[in-house]
From Swiss-Prot:
It comes from Homo sapiens (Human). Residues 47-61 have a biased composition (Basic and acidic residues). This is PiggyBac transposable element-derived protein 4. Residues 1-73 are annotated as: Disordered. PANTHER family: PIGGYBAC TRANSPOSABLE ELEMENT-DERIVED PROTEIN 4. Residues 62-72 have a biased composition (Low complexity). It comes from the Eukaryota. InterPro entries: PGBD, PGBD4_Znf_C. Signal peptide: none annotated.
Length: 585
């Protein structure tokens, strides 16, 4: 039966050769333009000895069967075995040491390591050499003539600028370097010229094209352009941190409207067209622990008992967590009774919404029920429950019973709902929550004509989100918001990796290129002289007051000393030295 919820975008001829796919890297001078410089399940929900009778529960005592290619599952109105969860034996938490848990950069570098940046640097320089070897354009010159090989430090500054552009948003990339008063961002010009940024963006590359093998589907060939980076980051996500007991598997979509063999359509998502990911998140925090890119047929997936691709995707994502008592929450696209049974046999609980047209769903549940009623059927460790509250919802669970509890609805009024529904709502939204946190920092720009560069931008944002989640777990008393964490991370990246004067602007130098007075001459600290109103006056330290505290608020610190030559209040140690030796402090 066709799936009305998800359908693929019609693709071009599947016989397109490898050369055509690699042609996306062809150099186009039009790419440049002139720049104007917890696990809160209640034990009462798991009453294993008996099921509490409910007046509105339909229990006719009859049994129901469902067939599946000759095999059948016998469902009954009463649980034949105790309903209980597996003991959780996992060891959740961060697995890699951090020397300073208050430093956002150290969390980011848990994932974005020197090894990864070195690989990107190597491939970017190789791509630049390839582009520079091509004949110049119609005007007789190429902007690649101005290329100089990049290094790890410059690329990290480049990534910091990309992150900053997600916060300080402008409709056109060139506007970040415009000198028009309405658009001026002078600090960005101090960090990197627009021309250099565009050159780096044009040459940004992640894999040698000659290593991309043919003989696969178009989608799989395309994915190889970013696959080493994707695999590296996903591996880091899963080795740096182990999630808590409750996890969720769902689909995520990265917006992309250009031609792409992997492009999908998901009408239920906020972004409906683009690159589809299958994501495993920690339910409590939204930490992205594992992910797969949808490439259609030929995906490297684990086998499943029912043979369904959706089941194979789930088993692939949770494979390293099996046997430890985890509980995975799933949406109806990924659910079948046989998948739940297979997970349960691997000491993993499962909860999720189910489609009535799935095989092995009890026939009793396919009948309509009245609003406010609940009907449940049991088969071994499985429970299938149907509940109607305006709309009919069917649930599967390996440990819930048909307990109904009282909760507050959106209007604050008391209402009754099955416990399985309540637990599902509390734990299933992790992937959508992570997507929502990323929407404030969009990577969608007209410059992203090449899909894998946009996907890299998306992976960069996911890495920052995971870094923030770990930071919050290690600093529960901190009130630093996601936006302030990003700002602090960008500041630390620039402080550590930016080399003043590394890239110069074209034409006449602006005042930013002139060595400031504070970096030359003779400077000595002196006490701020007394005034008629104050015997011991103080001033705000220039360095301290430019920093932020652990809560993301600006620091205010008074000092008795100042530089007489610069007439600037400064703490003697260490701010006086910093102010007179660092161009960007």
């Amino acid at each position: 039966m066709s799936n009305p919820r998800k359908r693929s975008i019609p693709m071009r001829d599947s016989n397109t050769g490898l050369e055509q796919l690699l042609a996306e890297d062809s150099f186009d001078e039009s790419d440049f333009s002139e720049i104007d410089d917890s696990d809160n399940f209640s034990d009462s929900a798991l009453e294993a000895d008996k099921i509490r009778p409910l007046s509105h529960l339909e229990s006719d005592g009859k049994s129901s069967t469902s067939s599946d290619s000759g095999r059948s599952m016998k469902w009954s109105a009463r649980a034949m075995i105790p309903r209980q969860r597996y003991d959780f034996t996992g060891t959740p938490g961060r697995k890699v040491d951090v020397s300073d848990i208050t430093d956002p950069l150290q969390y980011f570098e848990l994932f974005f390591t020197e090894e990864l940046v070195s690989k990107i640097t190597r491939e970017t320089n190789a791509q630049a050499a390839l582009l520079a070897s091509k004949p110049p354009g119609p005007k007789g010159f190429s902007r690649m003539d101005k290329w100089k090989d990049t290094d790890n430090d410059e690329l990290k500054v480049f990534f910091a600028v990309m992150l900053l552009q997600g916060i300080v948003q402008k409709p056109e990339l060139e506007m970040f370097w415009s000198t028009r008063p309405l658009l001026d961002t002078p600090y960005l010009r101090q960090i990197m010229t627009g021309e250099r940024f565009l050159l780096l963006f044009r040459c940004l590359h992640f894999v040698n094209n000659s290593s991309i093998s043919a003989g696969q589907s178009k989608a799989q060939i395309s994915l190889q352009k970013i696959k080493p980076v994707f695999d590296f980051l996903v591996n880091k996500f899963s080795t740096v941190y182990t999630p808590n007991r409750n996890i969720a598997v769902d689909e995520s979509l990265m917006l992309f409207k250009g031609p792409l063999a992997m492009k999908q359509y998901l009408p239920t998502k906020r972004v409906r067209f683009g690159l589809k990911l299958y994501v495993l998140c920690e339910s409590q925090s939204g930490y992205v622990w594992n992910a797969l890119v949808h490439t259609g047929p030929g995906m490297n997936l684990k086998d499943s008992a029912d043979g369904l691709k959706s089941s194979r995707i789930v088993l692939t994502l949770v494979n390293d967590l099996l046997g430890q008592g985890y509980c995975v929450f799933l949406d109806n696209f990924n659910i079948s009774p046989m998948l739940f049974r297979e997970l349960h046999q691997n000491r993993t609980d499962a909860v999720g919404t189910a489609r009535l047209n799935r095989k092995q769903i009890p026939n009793d549940l396919k009948k309509r029920i009245a609003k406010g009623t609940t009907v449940a059927r049991f088969c071994g460790e499985l429970m299938a429950l149907k509940w109607c509250d305006g709309k009919e919802v069917t649930m599967l669970s390996t440990f819930h019973n048909d307990t109904v509890i009282e909760v507050n609805n959106r209007n604050g009024k008391k209402t009754k709902r099955p416990r399985v529904i309540v637990d599902y709502n509390e734990n299933m939204g992790a992937v959508d929550s992570a997507d929502q946190m990323l929407t404030s920092y969009p990577s969608e720009r007209k410059r992203h004509k090449v899909w894998y560069k946009k996907f890299f931008h998306h992976l960069l944002h996911i890495t920052v989100l995971n870094s923030y989640i770990l930071f919050k777990k290690d600093n529960p008393e901190h009130t630093m918001s996601h936006i302030n964490f990003r700002l602090a991370l960008i500041e630390r990246m620039l402080e550590k990796h930016h080399k003043p004067g590394q890239q110069h602007l074209r034409g006449r130098p602006c005042s930013d290129d002139v060595t400031p007075l504070r970096l030359s001459g003779r400077h000595f600290p002196k006490s701020i002289p007394a005034t008629s109103g104050k015997q011991n006056p103080t001033g705000r330290c220039k360095i301290c007051c430019s920093q932020y505290d652990k809560d993301g608020k600006k620091i205010r610190k008074e000092t008795r000393y100042f530089c007489a030559e610069c007439d600037v209040p400064l703490c003697v140690v260490p701010c006086f030295e910093i102010y007179h030796t660092k161009k960007n402090y």
